[in-house]
Regions:
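Short, high-confidence coil segments that cap the C-terminus of an alpha-helix
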Residues: 7, 34-37, 120
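Conserved catalytic core of nucleotide-sugar-dependent glycosyltransferases
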Residues: 2, 18-97
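Active-site nucleotide-sugar/metal-binding loop of Leloir-type enzymes
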Residues: 1-9
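Structural element of the ATP-grasp superfamily
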Residues: 1, 84, 89, 111-115, ...
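C-terminal catalytic/acceptor-binding lobe
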Residues: 96-206
């Protein structure tokens, strides 16, 4: 659909998930606010280490404070539903042989790689309905989800990062060094939640 309908808004979903009724309206509202960005109801914050990316397990998905503006360090997660704006999808998105050999089971990462190439940011859209998508069927120990979390995503992300460094060195430098490391990210999180606690305390004090 992303290739066939390049000049249209495209919303993608997982076919084994039951979604909240507000899913489409949430994504369309995100698009209306920032029509140049990808809108996603689930995202992860990509973090870096000194010589590479932080483990996928540490890419935080609790990102309420980052839901205001589109960012290049967010990775859209397809299971939550994703809205792609018209156009701005180059041919590299659809290189099927490369996609299958590098990211056959990690389409979220393949798409993020191409979003970096095409300078497309991601907007985290806070779901109107807080209930998470309900996956149909059981997730076993040998499932694709478990395989990706336990190293599959890390290998794919490292391969794509090296591909970016080789193909677009200046773009790689700009994007990679714009990422936060774990300590920087943790400090921002602490400051955010400390401010919430102070605000709630002040409200109670004034009552």
């Amino acid at each position: 659909s992303l290739q066939k309908y390049r000049e249209d808004i495209v919303i993608t979903v997982d076919d084994d998930v039951i979604y909240a009724e507000s899913m489409i309206s949430d994504l369309v509202k995100g698009y209306d606010r920032f029509p140049y960005a990808i809108s996603a109801r689930r995202t992860r914050m990509i973090l870096r280490r000194e010589n590479g990316l932080e483990s996928y397990k540490r890419w935080d998905g609790n990102l309420e404070e980052y839901a205001k503006v589109p960012r290049m360090d967010l990775c859209a997660i397809g299971v939550g539903g994703v809205c792609y704006p018209p156009g701005a999808r180059s041919e590299s998105w659809f290189e099927k042989e490369d996609m299958m050999s590098i990211a056959g089971n990690q389409d979220d990462l393949w798409l993020k790689y191409n979003e970096i190439l095409d300078h497309i940011p991601v907007l985290y859209v806070l779901p109107t309905q807080k209930d998470s998508p309900i996956r149909i069927g059981n997730v076993g120990k040998n499932s694709l989800f478990c395989s990706n979390i336990n190293g599959g995503n890390d290998h794919c992300a490292s391969t794509l990062l090296e591909r970016l460094r080789t193909a677009q060195p200046s773009q790689y430098q700009k994007w990679f060094y714009s990422l936060m490391n774990w300590n920087e990210y943790a400090a921002q999180k602490r400051a955010y939640y400390s401010n919430i606690i102070r605000t709630d305390f002040d409200k109670e004090k004034d009552m």
